[in-house]
């Protein structure tokens, strides 16, 4: 079930400018992308009490979060909306056809190189393009390149072991170099075109493709001309969305916005005159911090604090600070690069500067509204639980498994400002009877609170457990064993109907049973934390289960240890391809004898 969305609190800070909005459910899955000439007016129409179409009502019932991006005009909103729909294919749209290092597009070496996403140190031989501000932005570029030029994006191990073309060939996203369906010369031309696009030379590329199209048409090769026409159309669409008129070079457009509740820095990345994407940062700030101080601190930490971060030639900012000269000099000394920090800009550059300011302000206002809303929920919870003070730290635990397989317990932490994700924890449960949720909860709580007793971590004000009477009794037993007898315990059980809003709650023991009204702010907080614990548990469980299933069939083979298992899976591109391999094919893998290959084959096909 999705957490309850407070539409009135959101709309109170929503902009009336043109833009794009994205609606998510309680598990952060994108439900719908839309555009609007007036974001506030359009979004308000979703939350009317009457007159909604059945499909719209079903969508609204699942909304847990709404995000917006302000654009300069409705046309830009339309272009961005279409790109997001193509990339994410949200279920409620009409469909016609995020401190990690920043990702790059990587082009490998070799006769038939691959394109892919790369993070971290640049150790592999090849070319790197970027950095991109987000994985979404980089996937958009890779998707466009795959549609236009069909350069492969599969892993080398998968590519090396293909005996027939894969689905990407069937849907015309790859030309099948793995099975010699394209010549090296033709493939090299596709790679060259891809590089031109990634280098920001789309205008030159478009002219070249247009000349080739006319040449193909003159030669009556209409199939080739149509293919080139489609490539040109794709390039024009991305140019309309991503290019700054009259712009060139590498630029970061940065705006800081501060009000009494916090600060936001919005960064727009432009490379080769092309907008790659944007990102919000929310630095911790003191009371009445000056916006120029926030900007200077951000530039110092963001650019000086990471030697691997690629520097643009120019930073466009919305405020000035006396430290800017020192920052540019330090960057020149440490990185050997000249960099200009610009404040007074004109034309299109001024327009993008203002858009960065607008997005920073909107993002901060939305964040602060959520904080205030969360604080009110904490106050309501304190009242219904009869606490003398508003709790400052809530922890919630949940268990996830598949018929006892790969059991994982989750711990999520919330404060009056929202989730404290740095304090989230997962526990891989071992040595308990399969499917015994009580034993799993006992192990997780004992491990967590045993560390707290030893001085590691903070004790919460309220401990929530999902599961009702049995899990509450288990939590109480553990707390008594460890001496935390004053900790407030809250059990959350689904009601008889098992519908959201009808939960049964137990305070400290199973005899203190009560329910809350469906519109209770305290209940909404409990639901939100419970659902977040469930989400965090199930994602951890799925990852653990997937990892176990990838290697379990090889674990009992004598002579195949962890390193050899990894090497085998890497060589074949995964367990599925290894399962398809014959004994002779397995024996060709590095370090695998014919006898060992027979043992591996027998283990994989034992059922």
From Swiss-Prot:
List the InterPro entries hit by this protein, alphabetically.
GIY-YIG_endonuc, GIY-YIG_endonuc_sf, GIY-YIG_UvrC_Cho, Hlx-hairpin-Hlx_DNA-bd_motif, RuvA_2-like, UVR_dom, UVR_dom_sf, UvrABC_protein_C
Q: Name one GO biological process term.
A: SOS response
Domain UVR span(s) in chain numbering: 203-238
Q: Name one Pfam family in it.
A: UvrC_RNaseH_dom
Q: Which UniProt keywords apply?
A: Cytoplasm, DNA damage, DNA excision, DNA repair, Excision nuclease, SOS response
Give the quaternary structure: Interacts with UvrB in an incision complex.
The job of this chain, per UniProt, is described as:
The UvrABC repair system catalyzes the recognition and processing of DNA lesions. UvrC both incises the 5' and 3' sides of the lesion. The N-terminal half is responsible for the 3' incision and the C-terminal half is responsible for the 5' incision.
Q: What is the designated name of this protein? A: UvrABC system protein C
What species does this protein belong to?
Pseudomonas putida (strain ATCC 47054 / DSM 6125 / CFBP 8728 / NCIMB 11950 / KT2440)
């Amino acid at each position: 079930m999705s957490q309850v969305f407070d539409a009135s609190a959101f709309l109170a800070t929503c902009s009336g400018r043109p833009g794009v909005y994205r609606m998510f459910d309680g598990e952060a899955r994108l439900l719908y992308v839309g555009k609007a000439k007036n974001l506030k007016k359009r979004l308000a129409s979703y939350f009317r009490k009457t007159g909604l179409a059945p499909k719209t009502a079903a969508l609204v019932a699942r909304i847990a979060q709404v995000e917006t991006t302000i654009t300069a005009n409705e046309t830009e909103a339309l272009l961005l909306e279409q790109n997001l729909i193509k990339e994410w294919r949200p279920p409620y749209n009409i469909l016609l056809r995020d401190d990690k290092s920043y990702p790059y597009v990587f082009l490998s070496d070799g006769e038939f190189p691959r394109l892919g996403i790369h993070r971290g140190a640049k150790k592999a031989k090849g070319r790197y393009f970027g950095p991109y501000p987000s994985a979404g932005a980089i996937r958009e570029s890779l998707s466009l390149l795959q549609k236009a030029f069909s350069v492969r994006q599969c892993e080398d191990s998968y590519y090396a072991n293909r005996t027939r073309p894969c689905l990407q060939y069937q849907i015309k996203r790859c030309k099948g170099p793995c099975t010699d369906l394209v010549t090296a010369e033709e493939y090299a031309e596709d790679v060259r075109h891809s590089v031109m696009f990634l280098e920001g030379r789309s205008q030159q590329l478009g002219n070249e493709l247009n000349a080739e199209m006319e040449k193909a048409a003159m030669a009556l090769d209409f199939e080739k001309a149509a293919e080139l026409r489609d490539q040109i159309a794709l390039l024009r669409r991305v140019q309309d969305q991503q290019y700054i008129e009259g712009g060139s070079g590498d630029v970061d457009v940065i705006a800081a916005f501060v009000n009494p509740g916090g600060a936001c820095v919005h960064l727009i990345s432009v490379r080769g005159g092309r907008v790659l994407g944007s990102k919000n940062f929310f630095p911790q700030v003191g009371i009445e911090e000056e916006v120029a101080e926030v900007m200077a601190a951000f530039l110092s930490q963001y650019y000086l604090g990471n030697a691997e971060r690629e520097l643009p030639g120019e930073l466009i900012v919305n405020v000035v600070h006396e430290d800017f000269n020192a920052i540019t000099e330090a960057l020149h000394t440490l990185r050997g690069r000249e960099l200009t920090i610009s404040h007074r800009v004109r034309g299109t550059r001024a327009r993008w500067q203002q858009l960065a300011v607008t997005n920073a302000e909107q993002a901060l206002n939305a964040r602060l509204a959520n904080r205030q809303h969360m604080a009110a929920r904490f106050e309501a919870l304190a009242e219904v639980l009869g606490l003398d003070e508003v709790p400052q730290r809530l922890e919630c635990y949940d268990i996830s498994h598949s018929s006892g397989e790969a059991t994982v317990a989750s711990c999520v932490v919330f404060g009056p400002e929202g989730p404290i994700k740095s304090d989230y924890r997962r526990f891989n449960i071992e040595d308990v009877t399969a499917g015994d949720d009580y034993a799993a909860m006992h192990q997780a709580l004992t491990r967590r609170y045993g560390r707290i007793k030893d001085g590691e971590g903070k004790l919460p004000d309220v401990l929530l457990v999902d599961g009702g009477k049995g899990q509450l009794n288990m939590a109480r037993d553990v707390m008594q064993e460890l001496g935390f007898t004053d900790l407030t315990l809250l059990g959350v059980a689904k009601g008889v109907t098992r519908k959201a809003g009808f939960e049964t709650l137990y305070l400290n023991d199973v005899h203190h049973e009560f329910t809350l009204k469906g519109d209770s702010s305290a209940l909404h907080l409990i639901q939100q934390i419970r659902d977040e614990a469930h989400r965090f548990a199930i994602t951890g469980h799925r990852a653990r289960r997937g990892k176990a299933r990838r290697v379990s069939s090889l674990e009992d083979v004598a002579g195949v240890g962890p390193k050899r298992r990894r090497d085998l899976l890497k060589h074949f591109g995964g367990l599925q391809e290894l399962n398809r391999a014959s004994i002779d094919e397995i024996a060709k893998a590095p370090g695998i004898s014919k006898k060992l290959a027979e043992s591996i084959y027998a283990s994989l096909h034992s059922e």
